[in-house]
Amino acid sequence: MVAEAGASIQAEDVNNDPFRVDQLILDYDYMLYRIKDHVASIHLATTELCRKQNQLVCTGIVEEIIDSNIKNVRELLTKCKELETYFEQLHAIDGIVSTFHERMDEIVKQYRDIKVHTDSASRDHVATK
């Protein structure tokens, strides 16, 4: 009984939102959240590295600390690359959204052309009988 209710709700959701726009909105919001999280993380790590670097300059530089800082900078670069990937995804979404109306207009035009052709063929078929 519960499985049937869940399937009914799921089918109703698909009927109410056949293009799954609600899911796209959730995915988009989550991606923005992840970008903000990455930016905050990079900001904190960069601030900490700068503080440590300033401390090293003031107190003297030790080779181990330099190696540790290089490792931290590499980790930051990895996070920056992940952030770049998210921005590329946003750019791809922008491309899809910007051409959405054009593609929908083309689909409607094709549908009307098919309907006119089908109606014309039906009239010709009826007329020949």
Curated annotation (Swiss-Prot):
In terms of InterPro entries, this protein maps to: CNL1 (IPR034455)
Which Gene Ontology terms describe the biological processes this protein takes part in?
A: endosome organization; regulation of protein localization
Q: Spell out the GO cellular component terms annotated for this protein, sorted alphabetically and separated by semicolons.
A: BLOC-1 complex; endosome
Question: Mainly resides where?
Answer: cytoplasm
Which top-level group of life is the source organism from? Answer: Eukaryota
Tell me the CDD domains matching this sequence.
BLOC1_CNL1
What are the TM regions of this chain, as residue ranges?
none
Q: Which UniProt keywords apply?
A: Cytoplasm, Transport
Q: Does the keyword Lipoprotein apply?
A: no
Subcellular localization, as worded in the UniProt entry: Cytoplasm
Does this entry carry the keyword Transport?
yes
Q: How does it assemble?
A: Component of the biogenesis of lysosome-related organelles complex-1 (BLOC-1).
Question: What family does this chain come from, according to its entry?
Answer: Belongs to the BLOC1S4 family.
Q: Which purpose does this protein serve, as stated in its record? A: Component of the biogenesis of lysosome-related organelles complex-1 (BLOC-1), a complex that is involved in endosomal cargo sorting.
Q: What is this protein called?
A: Biogenesis of lysosome-related organelles complex 1 subunit CNL1
Q: Which organism is it from?
A: Eremothecium gossypii (strain ATCC 10895 / CBS 109.51 / FGSC 9923 / NRRL Y-1056) (Yeast)
